[in-house]
Each structure stands twice: as C-alpha cells, then as structure tokens.
Amino acid sequence: MMERFEKIEMKIPAKAEYVAIIRLTMAGVANRTGFAYDDIEDMKIAISEACTNIVQHAYKEDVGEIAIVFGLYEDRLEIMVADNGVSFDFNNLRSKVGPYDISKPVEHLPENGLGLYLINTLMDDIQIMHDEGMTVLMTKYIQREQVENDGNPISTYNSY
C-alpha cells in the first residue's frame, strides 16, 4: 500500500524575480505541516539555492520554467525542483565543495557549488536526477519533539 500524502504543484518562469514566490509558498506549506521555525528557514535557503541554480545554469538564452512539487507526508516534506534546461554534473561539482576552510582567505572560496553544499547540509536527504534537464529532490523530516532546558521533551504540536 502506498504511503498517503498531499501534493502541491507549481510552475514559474525561470527568472530570479520569481524565486521569492516559491520560497514564500514553501514557508507556508512547511508551517502548515508543523515544522519548527529554524527548519523552515533552512528549507527556504535550500529551495532558493535550487531555484537559483536553475535560473543561472539551465536556460542559457531562453526563458524556461521551473517546476516545483511539494509532497506533504505525515513525517516529512519532500520538495522537487525541476527544469528542462541544460544539466550540469552535480556529482562532479559536489566533489569540489565542502566545509569552509578557515585557514584560506575569503578570495579563495569557490564561486560555484556553495549553493549545492548548502542544500546538502540543510536538508535531511537530497537526490539529483539527470534526464532532460535536472531534478533535485530534497527531503526534510519533521522533528515533533524538542527538549527544554531542563531536559523534558515538549511537543511542537498545537494543543487545541
């Protein structure tokens, strides 16, 4: 039996001025799903980076579309960001990025690839598929319990 979930789909022009719409939509969906503020902020950065990569790399001269699908599950939010443009080799780029080395001057930071490193760091799971374009599937699990200073768990659920 398939796991039940709700799906929200959107398409926007692959232009920088539309990325904020996706970020705000994702924040609303994540808030409704029960995510903590810090997790929502992390997901906002991750989805912004994924969309910005498409805007910068996928469509050279043409203006294409970004397709976004939110999968709302009981324990997680899956976010798929896809394009039909030119792919780049994520695994090759991923191998070139990593944690910031404090001993290196700021001038030596890589210009490209830091966004993918951020996505990988901020999300619980990330999968990349190269077909006709590129699809990024990001997953964030809901942390239902948090611990107060005295060590007692508190629920993030509203108690209405």
UniProtKB/Swiss-Prot annotation:
Listed under catalytic activity are: L-seryl-[protein] + ATP = O-phospho-L-seryl-[protein] + ADP + H(+); L-threonyl-[protein] + ATP = O-phospho-L-threonyl-[protein] + ADP + H(+)
Keyword list, A-Z: ATP-binding, Kinase, Nucleotide-binding, Serine/threonine-protein kinase, Transferase
Q: What is the originating organism of this protein?
A: Bacillus cereus (strain AH187)
Q: What is the lineage of its organism?
A: Bacteria, Bacillati, Bacillota, Bacilli, Bacillales
Q: What is its EC number?
A: 2.7.11.1
Q: What are this entry's molecular-function GO terms?
A: ATP binding; protein serine kinase activity; protein serine/threonine kinase activity; sigma factor antagonist activity
HAMAP family on file: Anti_sigma_B
What is this protein identified as?
A: Serine-protein kinase RsbW
What NCBIfam families does the record tag this protein with? PRK04069.1 (NF003144), rsbW_low_gc (TIGR01924)
Query: InterPro entries, from UniProt?
Result: Anti-sigma-factor_SerPK, HATPase_C_sf, RsbW
Q: Which family does it belong to?
A: Belongs to the anti-sigma-factor family.
